[in-house]
Amino acid sequence: MKKHLLILSLVFLAFASCKKDEAPFDASAQAAKDETAIQAYLSAHADINATKDANGVYYQVITEGNGAAATATSTVTVNYIGKLLDGTQFDTGTGLAVKLSDNIIKGWKLGLLHAKTGGRILLIVPSALAYGNKASGLKIPANAVLVFTIDILGIS
């Protein structure tokens, strides 16, 4: 019996050691892929006139809003829809209060700084400013560029 367990263990070890290592993640190559995908998305959606900010977030202020502007320490109350570039909706929220200094994706922390109370903003977030090379749940794959339409209900 011990002999069979030893042989079985050795066979298992042999197969486990044959597993190939994953290629190292190349952030600059992924950034280039994201940029190409975003440009294709913008070309296919002529109604979107987004600006790329210094941090790499694309944004379009759809409705300016007339209230206070967000700051890095603001709490922003929003309604939002999140989609992948292919249009697949992965999330939606109403009346969500988000503190920009908390643990949220960088794309929101940076992109919502372009928003004011009462406004609507479109954010196109490269993967590095979203979930990076890790999937999030079942609906957001690794290296996904995310598109958000966000209504700003209040800023405090």
What are these regions (language model features)?
Residues 13-17:
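C-terminal motif of bacterial Sec signal peptides marking the signal peptidase cleavage site
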